[in-house]
């Protein structure tokens, strides 16, 4: 008889089925409303990122700007993750009537759940590295004013390649381990069983989160100090992209701080842990939802190009092909 939780057999092997019974949902309407709300803002984030990527790659002036190329790499990963969450991850958590219908298909090893779970953790690793490089990009634009363009023409391609490769250092463990589903409320979510106990996925993420936390704060402070020493016309030109980067940095550092807390302090502060468990998914969602909104709101020229707006005002705007 199935239980309402996953039970690992004493001599568990990779191919063993891991069945469970779905929990009863006391409020199906609320669960469906939660899915509707979360899927709505995830779709908005994905659509806005698609519009930004399309605009950047169809405008030479944007492609010449290293920041926009770094952002597009981050946006492409965000589009994939938002889409995967809407059509897979959140569906089976919140559309609870699907649990008894769909869960038996995933009691045995599934390539679908493995791809989803690996991509989810890849995106976490990718986000930390992309935020480091975007923050570094803004710092060099302010600190190394005359050398910024030349520097990024030389390092942009290697940086993009590194950004896509480094997160593989996290997901190799998932690819070799058993990925399974477990009850989550009245639905189910995806988890994994360690194949290498000495290389816990949280520890692998911890290295990236800690590195991101330290470097982003350093770049953030250096950028602010640099802006205070620039002429007003330069500060006006850089303010939009710098503010966007700062918003993204705060989001990423907040998420990294929560993950660091879970590794080191969660066992000692159960009350705080329960609160953070409720908000951590929202913080994760914000990484790929608020960023495109902030970029479109703050970049006047990009907003005009995306929505085909005609500017009849005479005030000076920030053009994308100028990184200075």
Swiss-Prot record:
It comes from Caenorhabditis elegans. GO terms for biological process: sensory perception of chemical stimulus. It is a multi-pass membrane protein. InterPro entries: 7TM_GPCR_serpentine_rcpt_Srg, Nematode_SR-like. Belongs to the nematode receptor-like protein srg family. It holds the Pfam family Srg. The chain crosses the membrane at residues 39-59, 69-89, 91-111, 128-146, 155-175, 206-226, 246-266, 279-299. GO terms for cellular component: membrane. It is found in: Membrane. This is Serpentine receptor class gamma-10.
